Amino acid sequence: MCQKYDTLSGDRDVEHDEHFVLEDYDSESEDQNISSKSLGHSSELSMSTLALLERFKKQYSAPTEEEETVGDDEPKIFYCSRTHSQLAQFASELRRVEMPPSLPKELSEKLTDSEALEERVKHLSLGSRKNLCINPRVMKLENATAINERCMDLQQPGMAVEHRCPYLPSKDDEPQVLQFRDHTLATVKDIEDMGKLGKHIGVCPYYASRSVIKHSEIVTLPYPLLLQRSAREALGLSIKNHIVIIDEAHNLMDAISNIHSVTITLSQLQTAIFQLTTYARKFKTRLKGKNRTYIAQVIRLVSSVADHLRSIQGSNQPPDGAVKTSDLMAGKGVDQINPYKLSHYLQESKLARKVDGYVEYSKDTANRQSHGKPSTPVLFHVQSFLLPLMNPSAEGRLFYMKDQNDIQLKYLLLDPTNHFREIVEDARAVILAGGTMSPMSDYMNHLFPYVPASRLDTFSYGHVIPPENLVAHTLAQGVMGCAFDFTYESRDSEKMIIDLGRTVATLCQAIPDGVVAFFPSYDYLSRILHIWKKPLGADKNQTILGLIERKKPILYESRDMTTKSDDILQEYTRTIDSGSGALLLSVIGGKLSEGINFSDRLGRGVLIIGLPFPNIRSAVWQAKLQYVEQKAYSGSSGSETDRQMIAKAAGRDFYENACMRAVNQCIGRAIRHRNDYAAIVMIDRRYDKPNIQGKLPAWIKQSMVRSPTQRPAGATVQNLIKFFAARGSLD
């Protein structure tokens, strides 16, 4: 664990092996404060970590009391969103803000225009190493985990000077760090600007930005850096008594769950076993203390998990299901393992770094020179799964999912409440914001159940457009009179799907320019296209797809991850600009359902086909609903019957909310500015139900037009023609 190897060297000298050997692990004191998470006690830190801290202590002089307190008492705004592109858009808007002068009014009035100082908000963009690293040798790794680990490697005390990161700020670089701080605060910069500034000055923007935090007024950062305690600690980020604003908050609960969930495959486990075994054999005579014992325990534990997955894979069990922790840890000798000690060892010994480093170093020279894309260090991934496995949470569950050639094991966080609670309790105020946050009940029930109602305020504002710029229709029947029922039991009706195609063709004739149709899933879109491509009757050249294409050219959103959303959008835009209009077939929850703006001619019509209810038969959703119902039952009072009814209602509400949040996101892709206008058509008889309509945003409900029971499709089409004619969109 002491000196780190030089992974960039091509030498294969035996001497290099010593750099991969774990330092003697002292377990005598591991029982002391083993559950403590504080880094303030040196007894909990490994020797190399202490050496690293000592080196940094020497590099940086202790700040004066004045320096330490500058900006600490001033309230800051931490603005958080899902992607860096959304944060860059916020930074762009922030540049337009004119701040009032901080000089007293009587002094500022005496200044001439030429003397007046233009003041900007002090803004800082924070990002991960992957977004801010400027070291070419590290940037080329591309994978976030590999970048993080290589960065840490280059800081190890034993790293040769010529191979250390030249951009890591030290005591001698203090002028550059101050220059970086001053330039950062001088103007509003997005994450790309921060990288460019770091390159220009020659200092790492990831580390240099830490010194800017306490001098900032607004700090922007992506979800993972705020929602993960370890990320906040790594950045030295405290939100105590500050204001937290979370944009795109409809994603918040899923984001918290995803950050604290881990998925691993059987093939990754098998690779980890092979690598650990190879490492243990290679260094068996040089591993001292408890290292050999703990490595053997890790191998036994990983083997036990892999064996159980293999037994599931070879059985007739369903494609997915719940897994008990006890079953995963039922292997030979695993019951003798102390999970708390082993968890502590994995975090302190840096075993994953040593093993993954040795594997990387030991690759065949030809492979290392082939410039292939590096993969995620597999043992780090396995370790991230083992930690929650050995420290199970009441809010977490384990599931397996069979693939064609592999099987996955997933640890899923079911309840985000406690992980978000520490943010809520530290911050002066927490603001959740979003364009389409309806329905709202989930935020109250699953993010703030412990907060008194008197401390919670909700605000809902109308859309920027006047109501007459939007028309929203529900459509329960097609042009051929077939009822639109896209429930699981009825959705494969060929007759209904054909009528859907004819109805879409008719709607495309009534709606000008671009129309975006959203389907519940990629699989169902494929099913529909299969039927639409079939010949109609005796004429083998006539198909439903051809009928639609005579109205508008059709483009598809592909499930293929190699197909970029930007490429689809560019082709879609070019087709519309040619004057022919276009129909874009997309998927709810897909690449084009969020974060993409179909403004003006790109989105004159939005069609929502069916309701994207999650698969209630899946093990994951059964566990989610069971957890929500049990939580509601435990928190209720009254008779047993009343409590059971409350529990069932809570589960049903949670299930419907998940569906309608996705629908509302798709609807929100159109209507992007005050002069925009569009038509929304929701195609399914269930959209007429009050409980479903009640979960639509208020600005949609006020423009809702319910079609008549007789010939509803014809009435809808006529209404759309009038709507667009009134806006001069039709010839």
Swiss-Prot record:
Location of region: Disordered: 1-42
Cofactor note: Binds 1 [4Fe-4S] cluster.
Disulfide pairings: none
Catalytic activity, reaction form: Couples ATP hydrolysis with the unwinding of duplex DNA at the replication fork by translocating in the 5'-3' direction. This creates two antiparallel DNA single strands (ssDNA). The leading ssDNA polymer is the template for DNA polymerase III holoenzyme which synthesizes a continuous strand; ATP + H2O = ADP + phosphate + H(+)
Biased composition (Basic and acidic residues): 9-22
Enzyme class: isomerase
GO CC, one annotated term: nucleus
Pfam families given in the database record: DEAD_2, Helicase_C_2
Subcellular location: Nucleus
Residues annotated as binding ATP: 35-42
Record-linked PROSITE patterns: DEAH_ATP_HELICASE, HELICASE_ATP_BIND_2
Extent of motif DEAH box: 247-250
InterPro entries: ATP-dep_Helicase_C, DinG/Rad3-like, DNA/RNA_helicase_DEAH_CS, Helic_SF1/SF2_ATP-bd_DinG/Rad3, Helicase-like_DEXD_c2, P-loop_NTPase, RAD3-like_helicase_DEAD, Rad3/Chl1-like
Cofactor: [4Fe-4S] cluster
Its EC number(s): 5.6.2.3
Annotated ranges, domain Helicase ATP-binding: 1-299
Gene3D superfamilies referenced in this protein's UniProt entry, alphabetically: P-loop containing nucleotide triphosphate hydrolases (3.40.50.300)
Domain of life the protein comes from: Eukaryota
Residues that hold [4Fe-4S] cluster according to the record: 133, 151, 165, 204
A Gene Ontology molecular function term of the record: iron-sulfur cluster binding
Protein family membership: Belongs to the DEAD box helicase family. DEAH subfamily. DDX11/CHL1 sub-subfamily.
UniProt cross-references to NCBIfam families, sorted A to Z: rad3
Function recorded in the entry: ATP-dependent DNA helicase important for chromosome transmission and normal cell cycle progression in G(2)/M. May have a role in changing DNA topology to allow the loading of proteins involved in maintaining sister chromatid cohesion in the vicinity of the centromeres. Has a specific role in chromosome segregation during meiosis II.
Name assigned to this protein: ATP-dependent DNA helicase chl1
Highest classification ranks of the organism: Eukaryota, Fungi, Dikarya, Ascomycota, Pezizomycotina
